[in-house]
Amino acid sequence: MSCLEIYNKDTMKKKEGEEETRDGTVDYYGRPSIRSNSGQWVAGIVILLNQGLATLAFFGVGVNLVLFLTRVLQQNNADAANNVSKWTGTVYIFSLVGAFLSDSYWGRYKTCAIFQVIFVIGLSSLSLSSYMFLIRPRGCGDEVTPCGSHSMMEITMFYFSIYLIALGYGGYQPNIATLGADQFDEEHPKEGYSKIAFFSYFYLALNLGSLFSNTILGYFEDEGMWALGFWASTGSAIIGLILFLVGTPRYRYFKPTGNPLSRFCQVLVAATKKSSVEAPLRGREEMYDGDSEGKNASVNTGRRIVHTDEFKFLDKAAYITARDLDDKKQDSVNPWRLCPVTQVEEVKCILRLMPIWLCTIIYSVVFTQMASLFVEQGAAMNTSVSDFKIPPASMSSFDILSVALFIFLYRRVLEPVANRFKKNGSKGITELHRMGIGLVIAVIAMIAAGIVECYRLKYADKSCTHCDGSSSLSIFWQAPQYSLIGASEVFMYVGQLEFFNAQTPDGLKSFGSALCMMSMSMGNFVSSLLVTMVVKISTEDHMPGWIPRNLNKGHLDRFYFLLAALTSIDLVVYIACAKWYKPIQLEGKDEMQDMSDDDYDTESEEEREKDSKV
């Protein structure tokens, strides 16, 4: 009997070791992923390191780009801020390109690899063009030595390089986040918990990667060593690419699922063609569910989505008419006349997400000020500490440290306390709650920035012509506004990553991550538009305006207070949209979640603590 027990135990261990994932992931060769030797934190940490190195490279260019434009290319403050906003916005618009190619054709891994190569080429081009053509005389572009004029060809080469960087980083970014999440099976209790934790650590890696850029590289570039900073960024991107490729055998993969745009259009066309069709008497029972075995509930081969009652016009795409019955008998269903319920629900999911997504744009307008007006404001303050000068862009280190602190506080203090006191059936602090908290903190951050600017103007020399460091107010007074923005990011952007990834269908996960990037993109473009409008209106009657080249003659504080007011209005609209929103429901997911919760509760406290510390 004891031999039989030993045999059974060995058999069970072998089965556990060869257990396949439940979410449909495959290995590099297209075989079902084995849980024990794929994905999880081994692959997750490789992806986090890759993200940190790529972010270091990106912000090595982006963090001081506004100063490069003003000091090297001789642009004024408003034009430089607008150009940075447009460039940053373009980065995140390219995220849609990457998400589309990933979900439709290439898959997440191949898309990440290709766009990282483009990213490296763009950084190399920028480094070469800066070293050979733009930084003349050598060492120019600091606070003292002006740079010479540049030809149209040189400026064109510069813009070509930075927009190639935008394409590479933008196309890569949403897919690396989703590829990282793919390494954890959400239908497994322990891995599902790790998947939620991954998004927090992903955003932490993003910020820690930019910490080096904002401090060491920021200092070199502020001192005029622009080419050195750009070459360091290039080296970081190359190391990150090599590390990413090394992890290839360990990753879990989802196969690309076809063009999501065509699926979206098929539902709209089919619903329009059947606009005069009456609802079937038996309702949901007479709607098309795919084939008789239910395997093709959606052409994306993902999990079924539970039917909902919103946007009932779209349901007509799944109504089965006499003509559709004839087509089914001939085994030739026309996807432009008849769509499965899950395909219809995919469209509904995206439509429900849109109001929430639109409400996040104003927050991104606030966030983008760190890379533009915060830097210009800091440059006009006292940056000296003894004989050492603080690079204005390095003040964003307070933002990064704040992100790290609040991620720790949220995951180890706030979340456990909230879960302890939540009522039965309650989900505790949801992603929507966290995003709302982020908006509140953003309002406070803009008020703090406006107050600091009021005092900066009070101690400023308004008669100066070269106004860097013209105010006696220490640059460290900017620390509160940077720290508040960092705290708001933990609630808003980490919440967004989790929310859009969880609320998009299986075949649109990269698109979900791209929505978060697109929020940043639209925020940058709206910021650029807002700055342009404010400058035009405030400079009427020959007034210097709110954001002139000499900030001591302007009123940047009023612009910050305007942003605080706009964010407050956005918060009210967001609350209304969040109350209206209904989350996606996957068939069988509730039952699976209940089982997962039971399994998870049986884990020892030691195992849970170990997982939370990864």
UniProtKB/Swiss-Prot annotation:
**Out of the domains of life, which is the source?**
Eukaryota
> Is-annotated flag, keyword Metal-binding?
no
Upregulating conditions: Up-regulated slowly by nitrate. Down-regulated by cadmium and high pH. Circadian-regulation. Expression increase during the dark phase and decrease during the light phase.
What does the tissue specificity note say?
High expression in roots. Barely detected in shoots. Expressed in root pericycle cells close to the xylem.
Task: Report the subcellular localization.
Answer: Cell membrane
Phenotype upon knockout? No visible phenotype when grown under normal conditions. Lower nitrate concentration in xylem sap. Decreased long-distance root-to-shoot transport of nitrate but not of sulfate or phosphate.
Please give the SUPFAM superfamilies that the UniProt record associates with this protein. MFS general substrate transporter
Locate the region Disordered: 592-614
Q: Name one GO cellular component term.
A: plasma membrane
Keywords, ordered alphabetically: Cell membrane, Membrane, Nitrate assimilation, Phosphoprotein, Symport, Transmembrane, Transmembrane helix, Transport
**Per its UniProt record, what Pfam families does this chain match?**
PTR2
Q: GO molecular function: any one?
A: potassium:proton antiporter activity
Residues passing through the membrane, by range: 41-61, 87-107, 114-134, 152-172, 196-216, 226-246, 355-375, 390-410, 435-455, 515-535, 559-579
Q: Is Transport set as a keyword in this record? A: yes
Q: Which family does it belong to?
A: Belongs to the major facilitator superfamily. Proton-dependent oligopeptide transporter (POT/PTR) (TC 2.A.17) family.
Free-text function comment from the UniProt entry: Low-affinity proton-dependent bidirectional nitrate transporter. Involved in nitrate loading into xylem and not in nitrate uptake. Not involved in histidine or dipeptides transport.
Q: What is the name of the protein in this document? A: Protein NRT1/ PTR FAMILY 7.3
Native source organism of the sequence: Arabidopsis thaliana
Taxonomically, what lineage is the organism? Eukaryota, Viridiplantae, Streptophyta, Embryophyta, Tracheophyta
